[in-house]
């Protein structure tokens, strides 16, 4: 019999039969869990130390992660944190704040490049129109009053094919830069596997329209020069 059990029994004898005594919990006592004196108390202290260490680790981890959360999520006017929308793994608010100083020069440069390209294209089309007009006007009439062109078949064919190829190349390039696979080389009307899964089409309609534009341009030039 241990010292704790003898003290507990003597306390019960001293109390009267009508006096309520404290509820004894011998199964949860730290003195009766071990075989000898103080063994259960040592085990309980070790468990408490382990819990305390775990709590300290959690508190330290929370203290380290809290400034990062505050830096990423700034508080609102009422003190509540603002949760930004995350798209493709990037916070657009942070990205927009960094790209804000460089936004207007890029836009101005793109507008100037577009205007320069449009002016160059208009200049080339004007030259082509003058050439086609002069070639169409240079016709001779024979004795039977039949117009005879100065251009031969092969010359007419080469000019028509050159115009059609130029138009097709321009449309093909625009479609290439505006397609779902701009990094694919060489560009092909046949759709890659990813594009086929997205749209369900087995061919790229934009490249087919580029080829059709070239054919129409070649036929138009040939008809004008005849």
Swiss-Prot record:
Its primary localisation, in coarse terms, equals nucleus
The membrane-topology field of this record reads: Multi-pass membrane protein
Q: Which UniProt keywords apply?
A: Membrane, Nucleus, Phosphoprotein, Transmembrane, Transmembrane helix
Q: Which residues carry this modification: Phosphoserine?
A: 2, 36, 60, 65, 80
A single Pfam family it belongs to is: ARL6IP6
Q: Which family does it belong to?
A: Belongs to the ARL6IP6 family.
PANTHER family membership: ADP-RIBOSYLATION FACTOR-LIKE PROTEIN 6-INTERACTING PROTEIN 6
Record's protein name: ADP-ribosylation factor-like protein 6-interacting protein 6
| Source species | Homo sapiens
- Per the record, the gene is ARL6IP6
């Amino acid at each position: 019999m241990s010292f704790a059990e003898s003290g507990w029994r003597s306390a019960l004898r001293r109390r009267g039969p009508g006096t309520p005594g404290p509820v004894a919990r011998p199964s949860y006592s730290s003195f009766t869990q071990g075989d000898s004196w103080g063994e259960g108390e040592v085990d309980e202290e070790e468990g408490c130390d382990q819990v305390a260490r775990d709590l300290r680790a959690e508190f330290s981890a929370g203290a380290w992660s809290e400034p990062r959360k505050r830096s990423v999520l700034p508080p609102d006017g009422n003190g509540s944190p603002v949760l930004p929308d995350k798209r493709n793994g990037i916070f657009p608010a942070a990205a927009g704040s960094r790209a804000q100083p460089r936004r207007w020069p890029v836009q101005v440069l793109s507008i100037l490049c577009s205007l320069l390209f449009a002016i160059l294209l208009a200049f080339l089309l004007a030259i082509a129109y003058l050439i086609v007009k002069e070639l169409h006007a240079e016709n001779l009439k024979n004795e039977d009053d039949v117009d005879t062109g100065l251009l031969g078949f092969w010359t007419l064919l080469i000019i028509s094919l050159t115009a059609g190829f130029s138009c097709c190349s321009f449309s093909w390039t625009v479609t290439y830069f505006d397609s779902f696979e701009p990094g694919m080389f060489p560009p092909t009307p046949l759709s890659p596997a990813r594009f086929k899964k997205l749209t369900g089409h087995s061919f790229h309609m934009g490249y087919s329209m580029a080829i059709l534009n070239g054919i129409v341009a070649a036929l138009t030039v040939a008809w004008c020069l005849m």
